[in-house]
């Protein structure tokens, strides 16, 4: 990928973001920053997004670097699923990935959340299905309020057969080995 070195920091808390970002940006010239980036991993997608926002607040132009996250590979997995679906809709049906009813099974985990946000921002109505209606509704609320989605609704797994009847797209984002 063209990188020379990587410096891992583990168990980083929100209170450490400012110091890490400023140590990164102020230890290089603005031209050297072109070869520097900050990657946020971990397992908590909401914390990763909060860390991105916190990191951005502590950059001082022209001392800025890209900040990106992929906790547990959830963001790249979701983006890949959506991209493949978008291509299939275009190639096989001459349709766009917008204005669709998207059902996301196992949707309360990080891949489901990322898929829901991407799908909603593409102009789709999204039904986020989980084992617990309360949890699914809470996650849908987070998608809509925190990430600017407008059309994510939580739903209960027990009703999934009814949701699948008029679904245009179905994503399975449950954990490996779980039959949905």
Give the location of each predicted region.
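Conserved active-site and cofactor/substrate-binding residues in soluble primary-metabolism enzymes
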Residues: 11-19, 43-50, 76, 80, ...
């Amino acid at each position: 990928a063209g990188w020379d070195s990587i410096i891992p920091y583990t168990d980083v808390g929100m209170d450490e973001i400012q110091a890490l970002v400023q140590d990164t940006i102020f230890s290089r010239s603005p031209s050297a920053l072109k070869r520097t980036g900050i990657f946020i991993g971990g397992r908590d997608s909401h914390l990763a997004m909060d860390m991105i926002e916190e990191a951005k607040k502590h950059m001082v132009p022209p001392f800025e670097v890209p900040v990106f996250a992929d906790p547990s590979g959830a963001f790249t997995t979701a983006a890949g699923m959506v991209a493949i679906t978008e291509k299939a809709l275009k190639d096989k049906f001459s349709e766009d990935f917008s204005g669709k009813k998207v059902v996301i099974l196992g949707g309360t985990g990080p891949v489901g959340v990322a898929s829901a946000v991407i799908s909603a921002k593409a102009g789709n109505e999204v039904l986020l299905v989980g084992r617990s209606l309360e949890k699914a509704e809470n996650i849908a609320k987070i998608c809509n309020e925190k990430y600017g989605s407008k059309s994510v609704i939580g739903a209960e797994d027990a009703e999934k057969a009814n949701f699948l009847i008029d679904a245009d797209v179905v994503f399975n984002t449950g954990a490996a080995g779980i039959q949905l």
